[in-house]
């Protein structure tokens, strides 16, 4: 599909995904913290679908879990293999493929991560197919954890980064808010994407037959802050994280967060 070729080209030749989590330390910290709530002491079989260059895959493998990484962009898989060789941590497999058609056996995994696919699929039928594939490859009682972009994320990006004088950005933002569609046109902004509302996220998980477990904000109210000074000091960082945790489920605050995480069970 044209949309996914555009997305693949963005990651293949325009954007360095390999150090994205270094550039977004609060998002990375919070994602690991939330994922950790669903990890067992026993060795788990985990599929990191759309896992890019393996930021979460290698973190999980380092803890002793068996991890298969899949991503749509060939460069990401090549970079993951290079990283594996440099840090001495092996994943079970490195697969270049489509999240809607997984190359795995039914009932293979204890945990499936979808930390990117749902926010790159603009068509609901594609998102549901992706979720149904995750359902298929999970064991009974297996857990799915999905990261999605908030419908309102670009409001904060626009005002924090002085983009509101850019007419094209404003056009993109207005489409985000009205329909959830993010189309970069001929700009250098983020690639083709879909921005969820909280209720739509819950609906799609349930349509794919998952039992809903939880939905939390990732950055929470900190999305509206310049967090560098809070994260550079250990004491301030712990204070920030403490209050993000305290407010991560408050309905009135969910829309502020740049990203949400939804958890379901097979």
Which role fits each region the language model picked out?
Residues 55-101:
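Class I SAM-dependent methyltransferase SAM/SAH-binding core
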Residues 100-112:
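A short acidic, Gly/Pro-enriched loop at the edge of an enzyme's catalytic core
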Residues 208-266:
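C-terminal lobe and adjacent flexible extensions of AdoMet/dcAdoMet transferase-like proteins
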Residues 121, 185-199:
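Acceptor-substrate binding/catalytic loop of class I
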Residues 1-50, 55, 59, 143-175:
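Conserved class I S-adenosyl-L-methionine
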Residues 128-140:
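A short glycine-rich, Lys/Arg-flanked "PGG" loop and its adjoining helix->strand segment in the class I
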């Amino acid at each position: 599909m044209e949309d996914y070729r555009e997305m693949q080209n963005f990651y293949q030749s325009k954007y360095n995904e390999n150090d994205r989590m270094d550039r977004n330390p609060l998002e990375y910290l919070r994602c690991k913290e939330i994922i950790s709530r669903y990890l067992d002491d026993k060795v788990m079989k985990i599929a990191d679908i759309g896992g890019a260059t393996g930021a979460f895959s290698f973190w999980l493998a380092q803890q002793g879990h068996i991890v298969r990484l899949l991503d749509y962009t060939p460069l990401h898989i090549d970079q993951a293999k290079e990283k594996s060789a440099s840090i001495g941590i092996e994943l079970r497999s490195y697969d270049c493929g489509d999240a809607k058609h997984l190359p795995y056996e039914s009932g293979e995994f204890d945990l499936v991560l979808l930390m990117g696919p749902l926010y790159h699929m603009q068509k609901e039928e594609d998102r549901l197919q992706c979720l149904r594939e995750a359902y298929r490859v999970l064991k009974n009682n297996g857990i799915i954890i999905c990261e999605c972009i908030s419908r309102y994320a670009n409001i904060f990006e626009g005002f924090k980064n002085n983009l509101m004088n850019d007419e094209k950005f404003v056009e993109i933002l207005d489409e985000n808010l009205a329909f959830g569609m993010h189309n970069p046109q001929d700009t250098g902004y983020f690639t083709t994407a879909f921005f969820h509302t909280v209720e739509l996220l819950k609906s799609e998980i349930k349509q794919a037959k998952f039992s809903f477990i939880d939905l939390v904000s990732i950055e929470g109210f900190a999305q509206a802050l310049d967090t560098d000074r809070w994260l550079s000091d250990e004491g301030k960082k712990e204070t920030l994280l403490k209050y993000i945790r305290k407010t991560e489920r408050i309905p009135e605050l969910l829309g502020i967060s740049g990203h949400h995480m939804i958890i379901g069970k097979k």
